[in-house]
Amino acid sequence: MFSFICKGIIRDRRRSLLPVVVVTIGVMVVVFLDGLMGGMMDNMVRMTANFQIGHLKVMTRAYAADEAQKPNDLALLGSGEVMEQLHRDYPEVDWTPRIFFGGLLDIPDEHGETKAQGPVTAQAADLLSEGSKEAARLGLEKAITAGHIITQPGEILVSIDFAESFGVKPGDRVTFFGSTMDGAMSFANYHVAGIVRFGNSMLDRGGVILDIADARLLLDMEDAAGEIFGFLPGEKYLKERAESIKTSFNHQQADNPDVYAPVMTQLMDQDMMRQTLGYTDSMSFFMLLLLMIALS
């Protein structure tokens, strides 16, 4: 039967060639669009998880209630003990602390006087601990446009738009002005290790990255963390597994009335991710459905 159909197509090209070409092109378009949409979603989930949310996230209840403000005065104290419990109960997950905060970055001239100042948003991650995957997770090696990644305490990475606007170069000494978790003024000097470009306007406009040990000294947050991120094995987000871990952890804390007790969320709970991914999946389905109807 198959041989008969092939002979018919070859011998009568005027009738068979156009349908074959149309169907072939249609299948290619469907496969391409499906792969494109899937790739875009995977990239969005990966970027959001690595920089903003994690696959899982632990914070205090008070912090979670005002999470958008990143209120470090409501941060998780005794984060080392909490992480020990997390590693013990969910050993397959890579747990790592993060701190988000803002301040002013002061750039001096050759005489040590202030040449320029600009507001920055800082993210502190565990970049120097042995075995930490944070530098790779944030893609720092690929993002470096000048200088090098953080290799020792007292170093900082500056986003490219900020660096170009204020003339910051690798090797420069800068001063960060901010406030401690208790509201007191604080400042610290850092050496600019490198300039980074992430290809994301929000990150590139005025972001800095430093090691979490330096941030804890600056913010007077010894053994504290604003948030603890959790990443599932293989850095691959699995909604059902993440939901199971979240439910298990929150069940353990259900009888604790303290507003500073830890609470866990997962990626789909954050920043309208569930609605965004659901909408995108629906759009992808309808696009493919329309193409299939048009080709039938």
Predicted regions: what is each one?
Residues 66-67, 197-199, 230-239, 267-270:
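Structural beta->alpha junctions
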Residues 56, 162-163, 224-246, 262:
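A short beta-strand structural signal in non-transmembrane regions
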Residues 28-58:
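Alpha-helical transmembrane segments
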